[in-house]
Amino acid sequence: MTRPYRTFSNNKPRRDTERAIKLELESLVSQITRLRTPYCVLCGESNWRELECGHFWHRAMPPTEFDLQNLRTLCRSCNRRHELDPQPYREYMLRDLGEKVFNQLEWRAHSQTKVGYVELFNLREEMRALLAEEKRRVA
């Protein structure tokens, strides 16, 4: 008999499941992104309570879900506005990345590449190290 995915005593996934790794990666890339630019890249808002990690290509595109080139610090309102009017964010990303890198990112986002468990596990280790480095840099 297989063990249940979740136990009744808590609602947390078991350690090192693909879901648990993705949840930790979300937190890691969000922290890294907000440490690198502690203000909204579109409007300049710097109240840390309002800042979020905004995905240019949405999270449902696995190849760029945790790609730091796809993530920028946005305030809550700009992140919501991006869903309805993507043009200002698109223009910013084109300026920031350049056309060549932007097109490569777009290609990766639309590719059907599956990100497997091993890739996620290795990416998590990279992001842990990168976060520690960013925290040392900021401190």
Residue ranges of each PLM-predicted region?
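A boundary/linker detector
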Residues: 1-32, 44-47, 105-139
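Short, flexible, mixed-charge glycine/proline-rich loop motifs
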Residues: 26-36, 64-69
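Histidine-centered nuclease catalytic patch
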Residues: 41-72, 82
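Short Cys/His-centered divalent metal-binding micro-motifs
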Residues: 45-49, 71-98
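Short microdomains enriched in Cys/His and/or Lys/Arg
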Residues: 59-71, 94-109
